[in-house]
Amino acid sequence: MPKVSVIMTSYNKSDYVAKSISSILSQTFSDFELFIMDDNSNEETLNVIRPFLNDNRVRFYQSDISGVKERTEKTRYAALINQAIEMAEGEYITYATDDNIYMPDRLLKMVRELDTHPEKAVIYSASKTYHLNENRDIVKETVRPAAQVTWNAPCAIDHCSVMHRYSVLEKVKEKFGSYWDESPAFYRIGDARFFWRVNHFYPFYPLDEELDLNYITDQSIHFQLFELEKNEFVRNLPPQRNCRELRESLKKLGMG
């Protein structure tokens, strides 16, 4: 069985997905399986993905979902991640998106950290984000640090910077009935909602190195949500829950 299960979600990012997949398959640590969970992307994106399927570490799954209404009935990336978790065989679980780049030693360094520190169930690294305009020019650069142990991770950490033991998921599902929350009320902050669940049991331990790079583009769901574009997708979403709500509820529980 592989040591690590990497779960990548994908949807219509033909300009970026090849770089994302390549950054994972070229890791210095090779004992992993990669789930590419595609949400029925266009043919252009699928043509980019297909050459990578010859690698025996890759497991590709494509949904048959269609239509805006169906896409807003659940937080789609959470549903895809839950599907992958049910199939995952790794001792450790980590995440990626189709516009996220792993640094070459990301898996090696995070596996080493968990192997060396059995008391740590969840770790996270620092990460860099490039914000791109419609011409794909970098207009802003930000860094999320990894400086402290936290019992209040929602909206402070990106899920592409996290690795955790599979056993974390078992505790989460036992308490909440699922791994990631698929409610569309958390479309904006699906990873924050998952971290909220995890923080009921475990703190997040820092690994103070930049081990992944993210792109925020006009193709991303988060761009659409944060810019509040009045498109059909946004109009069909229910009112969105927020970071403050999650963080305050953890504080009331004595977490952070």
UniProtKB/Swiss-Prot annotation:
Keyword terms of this UniProt record: Disulfide bond, Glycosyltransferase, Transferase
SUPFAM superfamilies to which the protein is assigned, alphabetical: Nucleotide-diphospho-sugar transferases (SSF53448)
GO function term, MF aspect, one: glycosyltransferase activity
InterPro entries the UniProt entry points to: Glyco_trans_2-like, Glycosyltransf_2, Nucleotide-diphossugar_trans
Disulfide bonds: C155-C243
Active site location: D191
Metabolic or biological pathway: Spore coat biogenesis; spore coat polysaccharide biosynthesis
Source organism superkingdom: Bacteria
Domain notes per entry: Contains an N-terminal nucleotide-binding domain and a C-terminal acceptor-binding domain.
Entry function: Glycosyltransferase implicated in the synthesis of the spore coat.
Family statement: Belongs to the glycosyltransferase 2 family.
Subunit-level organization: Monomer in solution.
Protein name, UniProt field: Spore coat polysaccharide biosynthesis protein SpsA
Gene label: spsA
